[in-house]
A protein has these predicted regions:
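C-terminal substrate-binding subdomain of Rossmann-fold SDR/epimerase-dehydratase oxidoreductases
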Residues: 195-299
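NAD(P)H-binding glycine-rich loop region in Rossmannoid oxidoreductase-like domains
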Residues: 51-91
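N-terminal Rossmann-fold cofactor-binding loop
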Residues: 30-35, 54
């Protein structure tokens, strides 16, 4: 199939394009930097580098005449500070709707965009696709509004919409300030790590498994084996955060001191996603265990 992927050189985008090319799909990789696309995937006849700013997505059909699936991953301002910027998130939402309209002009059979666990707001309950949403950050508010706007546009232009509600993804290329990246860096150096009590439940999904899930889900929806709509994107491994941290130390053979309780947090929230809907749609959720993912990241 022919895939259009915006944000193709980003964290999740690169993993997705890698996987799509690996299993034989044709990819139109949309990025602000054509040179970066060419550097990531040189001499591959199945990839087409498309240079386009997010504000210009409405003109993408001038460079791409037809495709099967449009996966919109580009989203400006994903740092902690930017997630509270209402103006920036509003621009993101407008770009998403432009992308959806142009996907219809390309005769795509499916439009895919990414939501977030931030749509729910703080919670310690198990979350499902039907759980109530009470976002507190502009980022979560915009993702939820994007869902509503895309669903309305989906009906208006008759283009199925897939809303990937991402939970907690990790892997090479992620922001260096994330817990996993920070812990790996300090563990490999044997440096002490200040942590909260880490008693809450959490769920980590390896970015390569995320790419696998996206492709499998798109294929299932295209073949009418699954319905479009909201899907929680997570792994089959939910447990205490402390269990993850202890496993990281063991796998990386680290001597780092783990200072539980050194970081005081005002609000402790868990991430406990129900993945039954996704599992029913695609079957197996993971190709990598947490340990296998950590080892793969060191290659």
């Amino acid at each position: 199939m022919k895939y259009v992927v915006t944000g193709a050189t980003g964290f999740i985008g690169k993993a997705l394009v890698d996987y799509l090319l690996q299993i034989g799909h044709e990819v139109y990789a949309v990025s602000r930097s054509k040179e970066r696309v060419d550097a990531f995937w040189p001499d591959n006849k199945n990839i087409h580098a498309i240079s386009c700013e997010m504000g210009d997505y409405a003109q993408l059909n001038e460079q791409i005449s037809d495709a099967d699936v449009f996966v919109h991953l580009a989203w400006a301002g994903t740092t902690v500070e930017d997630r509270y910027s209402t103006d920036l998130q509003e621009k993101n939402m407008r770009s998403t709707l432009d992308a959806m309209r142009v996907a219809k002009q390309m005769n795509c059979r499916l439009f895919v965009a990414t939501g977030s666990q931030a749509e729910y707001g703080p919670t310690n309950d198990m979350i499902t696709e039907l759980s109530p949403c009470h976002p507190v950050m502009a980022y979560g508010v915009s993702k939820l509004r994007m869902l509503e706007e895309c669903c309305a546009l989906s009906e208006q232009i008759n283009l199925p919409y897939l809303h990937l509600r991402i939970c907690s993804v990790f892997g090479k290329g992620d922001h260096p300030y994330t817990l996993i990246e920070t812990a790996i860096s300090r563990m490999l150096k044997g440096e002490p790590i200040d942590l909260s009590e880490c008693t809450q439940n959490w769920n980590f999904l390896y970015v390569k498994d995320m790419a696998y899930q996206i492709e499998r889900l798109c294929k299932a929806v295209i073949k009418n084996d699954a319905q479009p709509g909201i899907y929680l994107m997570a792994s089959n491994d939910t447990r205490t955060l402390k269990s993850y941290i202890e496993e990281m130390k063991r796998v990386l053979k680290s001597s780092a001191e783990l200072r539980y309780g050194a970081l005081k947090t005002k609000q402790v929230t868990s991430l406990n996603p129900d993945t039954s809907k996704l599992k029913n749609a695609i079957g197996k959720l993971n190709n990598y265990s947490f340990e296998q993912a950590l080892l793969d990241m060191q290659k």
